Amino acid sequence: MKLNTYIDHTKLGPIVTLSDIDTLIDEAIEHQFKSVCVSPIWVAHAKSRLEGTGVLVCTVVGFPFGTHLPKVKAFETKEAIKQGADEIDMVVDVDAVRSKDRSRVSKDIKAVVKAAQGRTVKVIIETAYLDKKQITFVSKLAVKAGATFVKTSTGYASRGASVEDIVTIKKAVGDDALIKASGGIRSKEDALLMIEKGANRLGTSSGVKLIKGETSDGNTTY
């Protein structure tokens, strides 16, 4: 297994410099990670540097709380694509999920999927705030709305992905969607276990440490 090909090498903290982004990009190229995941303001720069390297550019929409209107998320998505984004990680309307508002959740996700024009869309459901029934509910709606992935976390909640989250999502989506585990992945062993349980992608800012078999200190943004 080539662990590097599962990793979205991520830098989404509130204080990020151009130097930080260039380091992220350099590491992604060196280790051939699947993508770099950066805030929208860095997409064009990342795209220009990653052209021809095989590393994708991923960005976030409705980040970090998912409280943007669907039309705003759609606009963000279109602009990100213009800047060069290959993949979109959107934060779902978590309140709509917790309220079991099927219409709101579907409208939210569909707005981004439509705006993405066939590009990969990962729906961040923020599992830290959901119980198993709610995780199942939103995961199934994400599939119906045309999302490519269900993603566990933003990095701004009380915790990241757990093995239990991955198992619950996998049971809900089967082979109809992929799964991205984000956060809570502090070692190579953690990463391999997430993959074993159904994760197809790993979101982490500790990708270099993971592939080297080192343990992250946990003070990272994923």
Swiss-Prot record:
The active site is at D89 (proton donor/acceptor), K151 (schiff-base intermediate with acetaldehyde), K180 (proton donor/acceptor). GO terms for molecular function: deoxyribose-phosphate aldolase activity. It is found in: Cytoplasm. Its main location: cytoplasm. It comes from the Bacteria. GO terms for biological process: 2-deoxyribose 1-phosphate catabolic process; carbohydrate catabolic process; deoxyribonucleotide catabolic process. Its EC number is 4.1.2.4. It catalyses: 2-deoxy-D-ribose 5-phosphate = D-glyceraldehyde 3-phosphate + acetaldehyde. It is an enzyme of class 4 (lyase). Catalyzes a reversible aldol reaction between acetaldehyde and D-glyceraldehyde 3-phosphate to generate 2-deoxy-D-ribose 5-phosphate. PANTHER family: DEOXYRIBOSE-PHOSPHATE ALDOLASE. This is Deoxyribose-phosphate aldolase. It comes from Acholeplasma laidlawii (strain PG-8A).
